Each structure stands twice: as C-alpha cells, then as structure tokens.
Amino acid sequence: MTYRYFYDCEFIEDGRTVDLVSIGVVDEYGREFYAVSTEFDGARAVPWVRRNVLEKLPSPGNPAWRSRERIRDELYDFLVEPVRGRAGEELELWAWYAAYDHVALAQLWGPMTALPREIPRFTKDLRQLWDDRGRPVLPDASGRHDALVNARHNLARWDVLRTP
C-alpha cells in the first residue's frame, strides 16, 4: 500500500543554495505537520520573498519555529509513523513544481546519501500530473506562500487529479 504525503516548502534560494524557511505536510487522512526554521538567513531574501513569505510567518514565539535538526527529527517521525513495522508499505511525496521542494526537504539530512531509506529519493510532481490529465479545473488557491496552506491545497489538487 502507498501512503501519500502532500507538501510545500518556502525557501530562500540564490542559484547556489536552497535555504529552508518553512515546510508544511499533510496526508490523505488529516494529519498535518508544519515547521518554520530558526536557521534561515532572512538577509539573503529578495524583496519579493520578504514581502510574500517572511512577513507572513507566525511570530517567532510560535512553537512552529524549530531548529533544522528538530524539524528533521520530527518530520521523520511524522512521515514514517503510519508505516512503521508494516511490511510492503511505502511513502510517496507529492508537491507542485516539486524539484526545489524535494531539495529543501532532503537537505534537512545533509547530502542526499544521508536521506533515510524510508523517505523517497524524489517527489512526484502534481503540476506534471495536471498536464498529463489535460489540465482539469483545480480548486482555487488561498493563502499562497504559506507552506501548510499550500500543502493542503496540493491535497485538494490531488483529489481532482487522482482519477483520469
């Protein structure tokens, strides 16, 4: 059986590095994970990211703010908990324009070779699936550039796209 996760990352990138700002993850059963990194360098953000991402983050006193190490450990537990000890179960990761999201997620463990074996080495792309399905009408997005809101929206997209 496949256990699917839908996620989104907000990040700062400069062509050389992808610096995680926040990550939101939801599954098909209502479980959610949200975290904001205490370690991103906001000074490197372009004005658009400052305005559309950083200014919309929860206040620094919010418990969503965590170190990258804590995000990594808690995200791992969140992802593997439903399949732990269940032979034949595998995880799927889904995102919209998934490439950078996967890099931001995988870099929580450092080099790609350090990614735990339970976590997929790639993220399936909802945007590509949308093209493959003939671009059907999708639910409207709200709260853009909020990782958890976007992850929920990715699940709503999946609900439309999962059947041809």
Question: For the regions a protein language model found, what residue spans apply to each?
Answer:
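Short, contiguous clusters of charged residues that form electrostatic/catalytic patches at enzyme active sites
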Residues: 69-73, 77, 124-127, 149, ...
